[in-house]
């Protein structure tokens, strides 16, 4: 009986850890896509061309 409880507890623990890792990875992917969104909030009066240049530069920098 105790061994069944331990196995069940271990299974629930492993599943919850896997779910936490998946959630963390999804959050990081979203964060990576939104890295340059702060530029919109800075009131820098960037033209669309300048903003596109910065976004392309950031993508090249990541590679």
From Swiss-Prot:
Highest taxon of the source?
Eukaryota
- Tissue expression per record: Expressed by the venom gland.
* Cellular component, GO, one term: extracellular region
Q: Which UniProt keywords apply?
A: Secreted, Signal
Places the protein is found? Secreted
What are the boundaries of the signal sequence? 1-20
Q: Report the family membership.
A: Belongs to the non-disulfide-bridged peptide (NDBP) superfamily. Long chain multifunctional peptide (group 2) family.
Q: What is this protein called?
A: Anionic peptide 10.1
- Which organism encodes this protein? Lychas mucronatus (Chinese swimming scorpion)
């Amino acid at each position: 009986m105790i061994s069944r409880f331990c196995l069940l507890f271990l299974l629930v623990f492993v599943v919850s850890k896997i779910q936490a890792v998946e959630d963390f990875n999804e959050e990081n992917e979203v964060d990576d896509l939104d890295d340059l969104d702060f530029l919109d909030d800075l009131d820098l009066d960037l033209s669309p061309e300048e903003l596109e240049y910065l976004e392309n530069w950031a993508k090249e920098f990541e590679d």
